[in-house]
Every structure is written in structure tokens, then in C-alpha cells.
Amino acid sequence: MSRCDLHIHSSFSARSQEWLFRRFDFPDSYTKPRDLYALLRDRGMDFVTITDHDTIDGNLEIADLKHTFISEEVTTYFPQDPCQLHLLVWGISEAQHAEIVALRENIYDLQGYLQKASISHSVAHPLYSINGKLQASHLERLILLFKHFEGINGLRDALLSELSRDLLSGLTPKKIEELANRHNLQPTHSEPWQKIFTGGSDDHGGKFPASAYTETPRARTAMDFLQHVRTGACTAQGEGGTPLALSHSFYNTLSRFIQDRFTEHLGPSAVLLEAMFSRFMEGRDPTEFTLREKATFIAQGVMSGKIFELAKPANVSLWKGLSKHFARPKVKAQLAKEMEGVAEPERRTFLMANMVCEQLAFRLFEKFVQEIRSGNVIESMQALSGIAPIVVLLSPYIYAFHSQAPSRRWLQGVFRQMTGAIPPPLQNRKRAWFTDTLEDVNGVANTIRKMTAAGVAAGEKLIVITSRRDLTVDDIPIKNFRPIGEFELPEYELQRLSFPPIMQILDYVQREQFSEIIISTPGPMGLTGLLAAKMLNLQTSGIYHTDIPEYVRILTEDRFLESLAWSYMHWLYGQVDTVFVNSEQYRKCWIDRGFAPEKLKILPRGLDTDLFNPTRRDVSFWPGAGANGSEVRLLYVGRISREKDLDVLAAAYHKVRETGLPVKLYLVGLGPYSEALAAALPDAVFLGYLSGEPLARAYASADVFVFPSTTDTFGNVIIEAQASGLPVIVSDLGGPKELVEDRVNGLVTKAHDAEDVARAITLLARDEKLRMRMGEKARKSVLDRSWPDAFQRFWHTTDL
């Protein structure tokens, strides 16, 4: 077999096609043609050619070497159409190059010339839109015009190569006839439904030549090789590109750019920096040098007469700072753990760069939070601004992830138009659910765990992504990223949030090829999920679980902060494709705030009616909890926090007790308000956190469920109590009221009105038959709820 990388660039390529490089006037490549020749031969290529953009100068540099031929990557256009297209043209002469330059503005003229002159050629990266103008109509005409297409491109995302092959392999004579009639354009070649695939690395940085290539039967000469390609006796081999490979090439080009432009200004320290950068690119400690290497640096300094420049404060500071950081035992141990089993230099480099940058970013963020708490706004902004240089250092990675990400929505449109169907890789089959909370005692965590478990049982691909230091949940698919650090929320100190490893999460989402990001919380993980979706062009759903602005108002008593919270919520949920809310009230609320009605969906909720069941009533449950058996048992289940309006419950309970009615209040849950509420309710019983069977027994063994919260958007505890046969008392503000039919299966009271809550408690406490009747109807109202059914409705809402 014979091999040749039929798509590769040298330092003779014109201005870079990458926006990041054009923005800073970086060259497309620094790889010298003769160096490239040696690399390709070392990597098993039998023939060598260079496909620089619209030039053959690089080929002329190696024309005297064996097994070479002249090629180029031609930029061309359809007439009066700004869409850029690239053709790979191989085995040409200087005279033919001149003809190609003259004809390249019109793809029809260019194709005719190439065919007439029997010049081997192929459409490069057919599904990659070079300047954002590519449409299905362009692809349809390319199919009619050309026989050869690049089947594996080693630079662009592997999904694009896979989809290109799928699209072109599925052509039929009938489809070709349809395209010819649509565009009034006859195919230029025989059997146009049978395409030939070529492969090339499209390497620009000199790091990944021959990562993809074209293979033919054994060829004695370059012309024999190209004859095999022309007749279709060839296959595309190798692998598609990744963001890490692209960014690795970027860093290499950047290093060469700095060496080229600034070596004289850097003096002898340039050698040191070059060596450090070389180690960095190999994923090794950039400060760890052998005795021999150190001696070489000193010798070079002596020979140049600039030995003392190496001792300048700036150079010493750089060396000392980096050496000190990498010498720390904790850093060494963490670095060793991260690198264990990782062989690819680009991944080792990525892990090292992220570890250092993320730790620095968290220190600056901690400073920001400290200054905010101290009321030092200017100082806090200064601390936050320090993150900007870190973003600049990581910009090649950030750019690579985004530029490599295929536009799934655009590709779906192309396939719909051209085939009438969406191929499996573009269907919404694998989703990541981002959350800041999973172990906490709240409805958000409960919903995520129940819904995910139902998804697993249904055989769907759903993974929860979070970032917690200590995570004990293991009954559902979870990817937990150890946080860089944690911080407390002001005014809500018991709620700790994580500072997640953002770039590692982005890399994971890209590698796992998720099709949709589900965002459950507006915290750091929710923002990370949104960033990943935007960077990788993924479909998004957001779930508005919690009325955050109302929480902020209650906790801070500050209307300005409440308005800021609303602005943030509006921005966050405005970014996603679909917003799930928990009730019709909140759906109307978001419509009033300008959201399109079709964007807003009600989140289906399930319930385990076998677990939460009146048959679990246990008369022996309460004596152990301090009951005397003759009292009417009032039950609250939920987080013990101020925003749950528990002060209203406390006041109402006191009013009822003052009338002499035999009632006893039991509270299940934990939270930051526990101590204060216990002091306000010395005769109530606090049971702490309960779950599973004990919680089900608590529900079923109570008589009335009281939930005065005005901030909940739904209320899982409401339907759990109803399933247990309890009448429920709720307020007329928030989502829970939509779960209760007033005076049928419960009572709806005025929000923040302790007097009205007391009246409702009194009514039910005095009338056992009313309690029983309402409890029976409450149970019937939720019997049709199940988690499998809720999951199916949720999952298929955003299906393609």
C-alpha cells in the first residue's frame, strides 16, 4: 500500500483561515517545507505534497526531493456568490497553477478546466462552512460537479467527516436526477451517485501531519499514486480533528511567532523560554531541567556576552515563580494524578494549563467575594479583572472548542432538505443535566434524581453533571467534577456553591458528544452548562425550579437586589431554547416578561404512589416523636428557611393553640432557619431530615399538611402529602396553589396571612370527617402521576 497526506500546509500558506490568527496577523503556518517533508516521511508517507492556500511556492522548495508532486488548496466561488469553497488540486505544473489562478473565481470554469486537463482534485471539508455562507444548495451543486470529496479531515471535528461520508454514501440515481432537475445542472462525471473519498490532515502547526491521509494500492511513482486516486482505488484513513489538537497547533504557531518576532528583544532568555514552552507542549513540567540543560543555558549566555541578562529581575521572577509553583508537593501530586495514563501531548498540555489557570482564577474569585462582602465594590472589580489575562492565556482552547463545534442546527437543516431525515448523530439522543444541587433536601434535587432514574429505566442516555467536593449519590448516572474551590452565598451561609473546572467540563461535553444541555440551577454549574452549550452549538433547555428573585427579596429585604435577580434570570433563561416552568402561573409570568409562549413548557412531575400511600399510616410512629395520640397532627416537610414563610406558620400555630384546640406541629427538614424557628416554636417537634420509608410513614401518620410558602414554583411535598391521603393547606401565591382545589382536596389561604392560615387549620382540626373526605380526594387527584410517564413527556418535548 502507498500513502500520502493530501491536505497539509507549510509556511508558504497565505493569510490564515482562522479568525483568531487573522485578528492578530499571525501566519497560517511556521512549518518549513523541507521540515514538513521530513516529518511526513518519518510518519510513513510514501509520497509528499503540500496544499498551501492558492500557492505552490512551498512545493517548489521540495521539488528536488524524491516522491514529491505539486499541489495546492484553491479558494473558489459560485458566480455572484460570496460562499467560499476549497478544492484540493494535486499533481499540477507551474503553468497549470497559473491557469487555476485565472479561473478560480468561477467554480464552473475551474471544474471544466480540471476535468479537461485530467488533474486530480477533491472537494475539501465539504460540510465545513469556511465563511459561514455554505447552504444545502451549494452542496447539491458540488455533488453534481465533483466525483471526489474529502472523507476524513484531520483538523475539523470528526463528526463533520462522518456526516460527509454518510451524506455522500447515501446518494442514489433518483436523488441525482432530482438535484439535476432542481438546479438545471447535469452531472459532470459518470455514476455521480458513487463518490470517492480522500483523506488529509489539514495540519497547519506542524504537530499533526499524517493524522489523516489517503491510501492506495502500491504505487511506484507519484503519478501512479494519483492515477489510483482518480480511478477511485483509494481510501481515506486516519482520524478527524479535536479542539485540543487544533489549540495545540495554535500554541505551537504562537510560540514560533514570538520567537520569530521577539528573539532579539528577549536576548538569552529566549532560549530558556523556548525550552520551557517545548516542555509545556509535551505536557511536562516546564521548569524541570537537567544539569546538562542548565549548563547549556549558561554557556550560551557566556558566548553571547549577555550572561548577566539571565539574572535580570524579570527573568529570575518568572523562573522562580513557576518553579516554586510546580515544586509544591500538592501541585506535583495533583499534576501526577491528572496525567496518569494520558499519553497524548495535547491532552497533557491541556490538563496542565487548566490546573494552573483554574487555581489562579479561583484565588481571584475568592478575593472578589471577600471584597463584595466588605462592601468594597471598586476593589472587588479589580480582583475580578485579574481573571482577564487568564482568559487570554486560554483563548486558543476557547477558540478551538467553539470553532471546531459543528453547527448541529444548520446540519440538521441540510440533512432535512437533502435527505428528508435527520441522521442518528444529529438526533437529540444524549443529554447532560447540569445542576449545582443534588444531595440537598429540596425539590430540585429530588426531581433530578427521580427523573434521571426513570430515564435510565427507559434506556435513554441521560447523565447528571455536577461539581461537589463530597458526593454520595450513586444510584443514577453522574459525572462529578471535583471543584477548584467552594464559597458560601451571602445571606445564605449554609448553601455552599462550587467553583467548577470549567474547561475540563467543556472538554468532557465535547468528547461525549451530548446533543442537549439541560440547566436546572442558575448557579456556577448552570452557567457552565450554558457556556458549554453556546461554545459547542448544542440545544438547550432550562428549568425554572425556584423563584430566585422572591428568595432574594425575602432574604435581603432589598428591592434593588430583587430587580438585579430578575435581570439575571431574564438573561439566563433568555439564552436557552426551551424553558420548563412548574406551573401555569409562572408560565404566564414569563410571558408577561416578554418570553414567547411556544418557548415555555410545563415541567411534568412524577410521583411514587406506592411509597406515598395512606396504608403506611402507623399509630406508633408519633409516640416516639413526642405525640400523646389525641392531638391533631399538623405536618410541614421542606427546607427550614426564611423564604418558606415559616414565620407565618409559626404565628398561625400559636393562634390555634391559644384557642385550646389539641393540635401538634411536626416539622421534617433542615436549614439555616432551624435554630430560630425552634426558639419560636418550643412546643413543636423538629424531626430533622427524613426520606424513603420513614418520610412516607410521617406523611401517612399525620392529619393535615401545612405549606405556607409563597416562593415555591411547584412543591413535590404537596403531591407526596396528597398521595398519602392528607388534606393540604397552601397559600394563594406560588405554584402549590395549582395543585390544590380549594375546599375540595385542601384549602387555599391568603399569602402571608397568619390569621387565614389559622382559620384553615382550625376548620380541619375540628372536623375529622372533612379531613377524611378531602384526604381521599387528594389521593385520587394524584394517582395518575408516575415518574416513567413524567419522564417520557419531558424527554420528548425537545425531541427532533
What are these regions (language model features)?
Residues 690, 697-702:
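Short alpha-helical donor nucleotide-sugar binding micro-motif in glycosyltransferases
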